Amino acid sequence: MTITDLVLILFIAALLAYALYDQFIMPRRNGPTLLSIALLRRGRVDSVIFVGLVAILIYNNVTSHGAQMTTWLLSALALMGFYIFWIRTPRIIFKQRGFFFANVWIEYNRIKEMNLSEDGVLVMQLEQRRLLIRVRNIDDLEKIYKLLIENQ
């Protein structure tokens, strides 16, 4: 096993740990989930570039008769990238005392101001940061509004 294979195993393990945390652990942290809303995906260009580069590495490894283990590890890395970037749905998860947005816990008392833009983007101003929440279904904005009013 080469150092390349060890690095690939490390990256696959990191992506798998992130996927498990995002899918199973995060919704169970900080109390019961009150509301979980699907968000729009950000640009997919980065994911296409990543999976494309891994596909080029697989092709290069196969044509140069590289180690089969490396080919399998690169394939697993491509599948993990495909899952994380294309199959997994980003979500905002509301709890009793706060919410998870982009895997970061934010308490409700940190929200200083909220606005709704013309194109349906909910803008939350925190102390030093502004969150742009783009929901997949525009009707979910009303659910978020009702939940925030009830918890404030």
UniProtKB/Swiss-Prot annotation:
InterPro entries: DUF986. Its main location: membrane. It is found in: Cell inner membrane. It is a multi-pass membrane protein. The keyword Cell inner membrane applies. The chain crosses the membrane at residues 6-26, 45-65, 67-87. It comes from the Bacteria. It holds the Pfam family DUF986. Keywords: Cell inner membrane, Cell membrane, Membrane, Transmembrane, Transmembrane helix. GO terms for cellular component: plasma membrane. Belongs to the UPF0266 family. NCBIfam families: PRK02913.1. HAMAP family: UPF0266 (MF_01071). This is UPF0266 membrane protein YobD. It comes from Salmonella heidelberg (strain SL476). The lineage of its organism: Bacteria, Pseudomonadati, Pseudomonadota, Gammaproteobacteria, Enterobacterales.
